[in-house]
Amino acid sequence: MTDTKIIASRLEALREEMRREHLSAFIFPSSDPHMSEYVPSRWEGRKWISGFDGSAGTAVVTLHSAALWTDSRYFIAAEQQLAGTEFQLMRERLDDTPTIPEWIAQQSKDGDSTEVGVDGMCMALSEVEDMKAELKLLGGLTMRTNLDILERVWTDRPSVPSDKVNIQPMEYAGEACSDKLDRIRHKLLRQGASGMLLTQLDDIAWTLNLRCTDVHCTPVFVSWLIIAEDSATLYIKGEKLTPEVVAYLKEQNVDVAEYDDIIEGLKAYGGYTLLIDPATVNYTLSQVRGNYRVVSAPSPVPAMKAVKSEAECEGYRRAMLRDGVAMVRFLKWLEQAVPQGNETELSVSEKLRQLRAEQPLYRDNSFDTIAGYEKHGAIVHYEPTPESDIPLKPEGFLLLDSGAQYTDGTTDITRTIQLGPVSDLHRRVYTLVLKGHLSLQNFCFPRGAAGTQLDAIARSAMWREGMNYMHGTGHGVGSYLSVHEGPHQIRQEYRGTPMVEGMTVTDEPGLYLADRFGVRIENVLLVVPYITTEFGRFVRFEPLTLCPIDTTPIVVDMLSAEERSVLNAYHQMVYERLSPLLNEDEREWLRIKTEAI
């Protein structure tokens, strides 16, 4: 639970500094200087000032009020975490929710400064430019971007991480760093650039075939990378590099400089044409004035990273086998443990972590486990805490969304598990979600279709019932990298990135009934070739996740013959691949759980 007195004290200290700096408001985005989704603790300023710990959201504090914007995944969680504080919850994408500039203008009082502050290192160029324009239009407000106000009020603020960097072996990466750099340079030339500033941490880790532990559950390291036609320079705290990594970088023709020297480093590229992605470069770096031209365009690296090498695809398949074994052992244990009455959301999350940790090449969870029992399952990104933890009973649904980081692959799986008797509504909602999941998993489509074109496939059955979910249907998954990866996504909002062979994507429709229960079913899929005809090349999905889907709650009559066939084929594959890795009792349990319906 949020300590409201601590939040109030922090707001008081912040406002004192705001008055000293003649600021009417200060904006705290979720990101760090690298526009990361998951950030090192040093840059968790929004969480520190508001108490809200979701991965997406923006806090704004004026001299008189405070508010927090977040999306539908976090509406319920944010409402609970902000309770008792000054912060008003602003539900994004609802018609009556003001934009951040609109709200700041509404809160402005006579005598207030017209200047709004933000740390320009922690907001993207495109976001700052959009916000500047709207603030000016609404009330002549201006933005100040050169102040990291948290340095003055966050007295025990963590430092930049110093964890050691490790080399990702070629057997898992499948492509040498030097070859990736050459491919990037070729793409830059086609975009009219002779170099680029790479800022996103997973892009840098992928390019250099390096991993680290700077970010919770995400094996990346705080750094910058400048790639030029004849050189590459990694900006990183020197203490993070072992002699082995220093020698490796030299072998790959990558120079090393200190992390804090990035601004001076940029100025050294006079005469170059640097590609800078306005969506991912922070505002401060975008304003560095050096004798170089700028091409403002999307970075080519995310799309390159999204198409996995054959070694990465094989790594996923191996990782999913081990993850599937851990999941089977967990589900078998859960079935026996819940009736004893000693388990809670937190205890089962820890049990699953322990079982995964027994598997070879396990490194960490890929995110904090979402274990929501009954009404907590309706909170899309609920994470149990000691304060919110509740016991599991032999009835109702447990929604379990979890994943692991293995050296050869990243996993992400959701299963909704029937713990005992459930209502007809539980069963009907579960079956609607399953229909959407199976329909997408079995879908074939022209190579190059966008994820937006696929989204309705997972929703159509529930749309017919007047039901829907507000989150995306699928996201990319990194290869021992971030569990959330782009640029491709399957969602209602337009995403134009073409879906091609080698891309991983999740299939995770859900339905959530507030204060009652939630259902989500998720597998990771791989885009693979299907057929080539006179109409072009077609692709399909290969399910990578190997774990039985609970058949107990299914209303079988609601499934079409094709949907039953898809489920039965999936379960046959799960049994065939996992059973050789299990003991006799586990095999028999899995055989029963994967029987045809």
Task: List each language-model region with its residue ranges.
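Active-site neighborhoods and metal-handling regions in enzymes and metal-associated proteins
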Residues: M1-I597
